């Protein structure tokens, strides 16, 4: 249960907009989670996203002790310094701190020694500051850092020398234009990368930038991509590229991502998806193609036996064929659709044959008609 509480707290901290929980509620949640590890933990626990091993020594929340940065609240190895108008990282952060919350301040720069000695640091939250620079040696001693939140700042590049222990990096809404080749070198624990709302173009992703990295979730929405990047990790389970400038999806674009389960391409400029494209992602369960310029249902959907959700609303689709969604081979086993959205397309909905949706969970799973008309 403790690990889920930690996940909930960190998810709230990364949400947009952020509504800070009361200090009392935050303390109660963290007390349940932050008693899990200490400096004597072995490497297996250090490499766990949600450490569960109990400490060898009894736990004492260090708000029993006087050491705490001025104006902050310290409890259960958490240092909570958000919304204080800080212009720099405060001193006197206890060495055994597991989580530092510095969001919603006015910090412009992270210096080399700001987190020096925090060898147990697990999560660092720096969302919504004015960061333009992070020293390349800042994270050399934070070798247990698993979650780093840098969203809503003014960073022009992904920080160098990130800890190899990092599992989640969120750098949404910054000014990042390039992902350099060695940015994630050796970061085998990185599983989640969220970097939407950055002015990133396709040529800004250098060849080999993700080489050797096992990332499961990447979101590069609200950027300047004109096509699906080809050099992302083949381990991807989720790829979200919504709100870009992608106009076509070619056969080779998804060939590298055969394990993909969720694909987000909504709110682009897609007019054509090449035949056979979706055969390259046979495990996909959810596809978002809403708010594009498609004139027909993409081919190959009926062959995706795990596909359950397909969003095609707000396109230019004029016709739906009886076999566009469901298998034509009687013995083929396919998951039932739980959602097919086709509303706000210039089609004559009354002409769609009932058999078109023979592999749908129920009538409520299909959305037709023109909303607002």
UniProtKB/Swiss-Prot annotation:
Tell me what induces its expression: By TGFB1. Induction requires ALK5 kinase activity and SMAD3.
Effect on the protein of changing residue 170 to E? Partial inhibition of BMP2-induced cytodifferentiation
The keyword S-adenosyl-L-methionine is annotated on this UniProt entry? no
- Return the PROSITE patterns for the record: LRR
UniProt keyword Zinc-finger, yes or no: no
Residues in domain LRRNT? Answer: 59-95
Annotated signal sequence range: 1-15
Which is one GO molecular function term here?
calcium ion binding
Q: Where is this region: Interaction with TGFB1?
A: 159-205
Q: List the disulfide bonds.
A: 68-74, 72-81, 326-359
Gene Ontology annotations of biological process type: bone mineralization; negative regulation of tooth mineralization; negative regulation of transforming growth factor beta receptor signaling pathway; response to fluoride
Q: Write out the propeptide range(s).
A: 16-32
Glycan attachment sites: 48, 275
* Pfam families per the UniProt record, alphabetical: LRR_8, LRRNT
Compartmental location? Secreted, Extracellular space, Extracellular matrix
Keywords linked to the UniProt accession? Biomineralization, Calcium, Disulfide bond, Extracellular matrix, Glycoprotein, Leucine-rich repeat, Repeat, Secreted, Signal
Check the record and name the SUPFAM superfamilies matching this protein: L domain-like (SSF52058)
Tissue-wise expression: Higher expression in heart, also detected in kidney, stomach, testes, and skin but only weakly in lung, skeletal muscle, small intestine, and thymus. Expressed specifically and predominantly in the periodontal ligament (PDL). During tooth development, strong expression is seen in the dental follicle, which is the progenitor tissue that forms cementum, alveolar bone, and the PDL. Expressed in the perichondria of the maxilla, mandible, vertebrae, and long bones. Predominantly expressed in the perichondrium/periosteum of long bones (at protein level).
- One cellular component (GO) term of this entry: extracellular matrix
Per the UniProt record, which residue ranges are transmembrane? none
Family, as annotated: Belongs to the small leucine-rich proteoglycan (SLRP) family. SLRP class I subfamily.
Q: What's the stated role of this polypeptide?
A: Binds calcium and plays a role in osteoblast-driven collagen biomineralization activity. Critical regulator of TGF-beta in articular cartilage and plays an essential role in cartilage homeostasis and osteoarthritis (OA) pathogenesis. Negatively regulates chondrogenesis in the articular cartilage by blocking the TGF-beta/receptor interaction on the cell surface and inhibiting the canonical TGF-beta/Smad signal. Negatively regulates periodontal ligament (PDL) differentiation and mineralization to ensure that the PDL is not ossified and to maintain homeostasis of the tooth-supporting system.
Q: How does it assemble?
A: Interacts with type I collagen. DCN can inhibit collagen binding. Interacts with TGFB1, TGFB2 and TGFB3. DCN, BGN, and FMOD inhibit binding to TGFB1. Interacts with BMP2. Interacts in vitro with type II collagen.
What's the domain remark here?
A: The repeats LRR 9, LRR 10 and LRR 11 are involved in binding type I collagen. The poly-Asp region is involved in binding calcium. The LRR 5 repeat can inhibit BMP2-induced cytodifferentiation and may be involved in the interaction with BMP2.
Which named protein is this?
A: Asporin
Species for this entry: Mus musculus
Q: Which gene encodes it?
A: Aspn
């Amino acid at each position: 249960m403790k690990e889920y509480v930690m996940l909930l707290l960190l998810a709230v901290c990364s949400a947009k907009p952020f509504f800070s929980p009361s200090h009392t509620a935050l303390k109660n949640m963290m007390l349940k989670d932050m008693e899990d590890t200490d400096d004597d933990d072995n490497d297996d626990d250090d490499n766990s996203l949600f450490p569960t091993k109990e400490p060898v020594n009894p736990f004492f929340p260090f708000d029993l002790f006087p050491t705490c940065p001025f104006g902050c609240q310290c409890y259960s190895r958490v240092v909570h310094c958000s919304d204080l108008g800080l212009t720099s990282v405060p001193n006197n952060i206890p060495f055994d701190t597991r989580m530092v919350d510095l969001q919603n301040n006015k910090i412009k720069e992270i210096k080399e020694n700001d987190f020096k000695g925090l060898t147990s640091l697990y999560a660092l939250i720096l969302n919504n500051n004015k960061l333009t620079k992070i020293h390349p040696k800042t994270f050399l001693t934070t070798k247990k850092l698993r979650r780093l939140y840098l969203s809503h700042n003014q960073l022009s590049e992904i920080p160098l020398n990130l800890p190899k222990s990092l599992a989640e990096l969120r750098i949404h809404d910054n000014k990042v234009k390039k992902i350099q080749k060695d940015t994630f070198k050796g970061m085998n624990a990185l599983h989640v990368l969220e970097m939407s709302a950055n002015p990133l173009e396709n040529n800004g992703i250098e060849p080999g930038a993700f080489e050797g990295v096992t990332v499961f979730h990447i979101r590069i929405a609200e950027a300047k991509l004109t096509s699906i990047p080809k050099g992302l990790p083949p381990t991807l389970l989720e790829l979200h590229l919504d709100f870009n400038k992608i106009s076509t999806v070619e056969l080779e674009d998804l060939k590298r991502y055969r394990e993909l389960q969720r694909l987000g391409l909504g709110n682009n400029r897609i007019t054509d998806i090449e035949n056979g494209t979706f055969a390259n992602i046979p495990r996909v369960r959810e596809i978002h193609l809403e708010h594009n310029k498609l004139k027909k249902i993409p081919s190959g959907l009926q062959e995706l036996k795990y596909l359950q959700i397909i969003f095609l609303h707000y396109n230019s689709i004029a016709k739906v064929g009886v076999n566009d969604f469901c298998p034509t081979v009687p013995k083929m086993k396919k998951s039932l659709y739980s959602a097919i959205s086709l509303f706000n397309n210039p089609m004559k909905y009354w002409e769609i044959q009932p058999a078109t949706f023979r592999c749908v969970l129920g009538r409520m799973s299909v959305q037709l008609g023109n909303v607002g008309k």
